[in-house]
Amino acid sequence: PIHDRGKYHIGDANVQKRVFQEFGDVDGIEENAIASHKENWLFAGVNHAATEPHAVVANWDPSGRLTLYTPQQVPHYVHRALADVLEIPMHQINVYRTFVGGGFGGKSDPFPHEMCSAILARKSGRPVRITFDREEVYWINRGRHPSRIEMNLHADEQGRICGIETDALIDGGGFASFGHVTTYYNGVLHTAPYEIGAFHYTGARVWTNKPASGAMRGHGAVNSRCAVETGLDDLAEQLSVDPIDLRLANLLPPHSATITGFRVTSIGMRECLERVKQESGWDKKFRKMPLGKGIGIGCGFFISGSGLPIHW
C-alpha cells in the first residue's frame, strides 16, 4: 500500500524518488492571502489502450548484428537497454521505429518483449516476432500514476495568485519507468501559464506490487493541473470574480519566465481565452444555465524542447 503522507522516507522503505522545491516567499503566502483553496485529491491510474498493441520483430545476421523493428516512441532508450541486456556494443544493434499508431507515452519505455525477442532470436538463430493481445498490453502497463495530491492555492487582495503549495504522493508500481521525471512534473508543470508569487512542492514516488506507471498523455501534468484549475474556480467564487477574468489577470506575458525558471517566449493564452469567451457565449451562459448543465474553463501548460526541463 501507499504510505500515508508525511511518513514516507528513502532508505529501507519503498520510496524511489523524493522531491522538494521552494521558490519565492513561501513563508508569507498565507499572510498575504485573502482567499484560499485547500483540497485533497485522489486520482486513479489510467492505461493508454491504443488501438495498435505492442509488437516487435528481432533478427540477427550472420555477422552478429541485431536488427530490431518496433513501434517505439523513444527508440534510443531501447537501443541503450538492448546493449546492456545483450552485453554487446551499441554499434552492433540497429533499431528501426516502425509505424507507431497510438502511443500517448505508452510505447516510450524499453519493454520486456523487446528484450525477449532479441534473446530468443539469438538463441534460435531465427527471426522472432512477438505481438501482444489486449490483456498482455495491460500487464506491461506504463500508464498514468495513481496519485494522492494535496493542493493549496492562495490569492491576494489584488486578485493575484500569491502562492501555490502542493504535496504529491504517486504510486509507481514495480519498476522505475519515467518515474523520476514524473515526480518532478507533478509539481513544476503547474507553475504556468500564470504568474505565481511563491511556490512550494514536495513529491514522492513509491514502489508497489503492481504494473509500473510511466508517461501518459500530458506526462505528470494532468492530475495536478486538474487540481489547480478547480482551485482557481473556487478562488474566483470567493473573490466574486469571473473565472476567465481571474485567469486573464494572472497570465504570464510573452518573453518572461515561470517562478521555477522555465523560459516563456511566445504565449497565445490571452488571445485564446478572449476568443473562447466570445465564441462560447460565456457571459450569457456562465451561472445562467439550467440545473444539470454548465460551462467551464481551464488552461494547460507543458514543457517543450531538448533541454533538461526539471530541477535535479
Language-model region placement:
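Structural alpha/beta core scaffold segments of enzyme domains
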Residues: P1-W312
